[in-house]
Amino acid sequence: MSAVGSKVRLLACDVDGTLLHGSLHISERVQRAVADARAAGVHVLLATGRMPSAARRIVETLELTGPQVYYNGALVQTVEGAKLFEVPVAPGVAQSVVRYAREAKMHVNAYVGDTIYVERLTPEAEFTRQLNRVDPQVVDDLVSFLERAPTKLVIVRLPTVEEGLVPSLAARFAGELSVSSSVPQYCEMVNPSVDKGRALRIVADKLGLAMSEVAAIGDGDNDRTLLEAAGTSFAMGNGSPRVKALATHVVGSVEDDGVAEAIERYVLAG
């Protein structure tokens, strides 16, 4: 058994591919491990690309309290709904994304507040509904609607996002958007000034913790800043090579309860 360098008082967990199995289920072992961590005085938070309503079931299942990180770091909000930090996408940039998606015949979701807006109920919208367990709302014209600033935009591609789409959009909207992917079907866009790592630092500061007292676990490239910010980091066994390369430890895959392994073997042994 190997302990972490400093006692962990804050643990940030990615959701999709980390906490949630492919069946969108959190195993009983992971639930017990999170409960044990909380009982030991560790504040556990979600650091997810999801919006609050799409993560509510997970928050309730794990009985989490306090601040959580949503929208890939664009929103930090308590479980009671108090916003601690939020940076949206500029309306003009959001409208440009919608125009681009229309020309390319791609489906786009716009996230305003805690609601998903779409122009049509396409198969991609249905995929979004099933993944998030939230019903998208239809508007006639997203370009006009997005005179208000969205927190996040997502281009949804089925069966998966084409290779090269994420870097292509990152180049096209350089300086205007941060582009990443948390699930194979999503190309996610947020304000370029935000990421999960920055949001984690904000939470640690609110809680009066040093980053050496913070641990984080994730699997995707959008988790890299999260792991880089934490004093101790864990990459899931199903994680990307770049995430594994920067992590302090590599644990089991999501199907093998990697989050529970990180807590049992390292966090609670500190």
Where are these regions (language model features)?
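Hydrophobic packing residues within well-ordered alpha-helices of enzyme cores
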Residues: V30, A55-V59, L165, L169, ...
